[in-house]
């Protein structure tokens, strides 16, 4: 019997938008090499692997190149699959044991909410190659344990960035967030996320980046709840609520593929 696997578009209500993630439902744990090979075969920004535990699910995330310690859109996709496939009741909380600790998700109508750790940034001096790769003059530069964050002067600057990914790959971090205050109705801020160092030139919609963006924009906008747009080619909407050292990320998802792994 094959292993059930899904492709889910996260942070969108429409197929072919948002960020696609693979979700693999494992009856038993598999070794890292096998999971990495599956992620490479799926060739999505992340593939999630779920294993049932007595008090929830073990959850690991792999890009086509490496395992990562935190991934928002693949967590949203995982929760979506558990509810849609009837593995959890709508009233049940999804509990995920991960490299970033216990993460939870709840269903609120047609929207899912995930409880993630805040990833606050501190002012930082970036490598010269990073600024050359982006060819921008940021108004602020910060860094946390995962990424650099660069605030730029306008939404247009965010949308028109054309990074040199070969140069950007040398940055000693998972990725680079570029953000600005939104000039579009209905959104508080916009961003893009680049992570060539882990095999993803540009991630379409990045939940984990909003664990940094939420606290960052809360301080500047004076708001606990915000609506964010990630301005990639596919685009996606993230609801963000900051609660102390936790960030609640909200969004929708749609399954576009169901299948079986035969290996």
Positions of predicted regions on the chain:
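Active-site proximal loop and beta-alpha junction motif in alpha/beta enzyme cores
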Residues: 1-70, 76-263
């Amino acid at each position: 019997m094959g292993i059930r696997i899904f492709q889910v578009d996260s942070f969108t209500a429409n197929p072919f938008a948002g960020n696609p993630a693979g979700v693999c439902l494992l009856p038993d744990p598999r070794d890292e090499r096998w999971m990495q090979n599956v992620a490479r075969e799926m060739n999505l920004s992340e593939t999630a692997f779920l294993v049932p535990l007595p008090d929830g699910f073990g959850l690991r995330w792999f890009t086509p190149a490496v395992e990562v310690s935190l991934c928002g859109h693949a967590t949203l996709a995982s929760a979506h699959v558990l509810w849609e496939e009837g593995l959890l009741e709508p009233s049940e909380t999804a509990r995920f044991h991960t490299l970033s600790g216990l993460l939870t998700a709840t269903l609120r109508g047609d929207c899912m909410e995930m409880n993630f750790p805040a990833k606050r940034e501190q002012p930082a001096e970036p490598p010269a190659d990073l600024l050359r790769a982006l060819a921008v003059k940021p108004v602020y530069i910060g860094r946390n344990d995962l990424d650099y964050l660069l605030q730029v002067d306008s939404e247009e600057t965010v949308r028109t960035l054309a990074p040199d990914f070969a140069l950007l790959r040398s940055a000693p971090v998972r990725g680079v967030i570029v953000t600005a205050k939104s000039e579009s109705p209905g959104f508080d801020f916009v961003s893009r996320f680049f992570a060539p160092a882990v095999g993803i030139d540009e991630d379409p919609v990045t939940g984990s980046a909003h664990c940094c963006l939420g606290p960052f924009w809360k301080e500047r906008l004076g708001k606990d709840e915000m609506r964010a747009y990630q301005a990639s080619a596919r685009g996606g909407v993230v609801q963000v609520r900051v609660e102390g050292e936790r960030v609640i990320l909200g969004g929708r998802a749609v399954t576009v593929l169901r299948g079986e792994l035969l290996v």
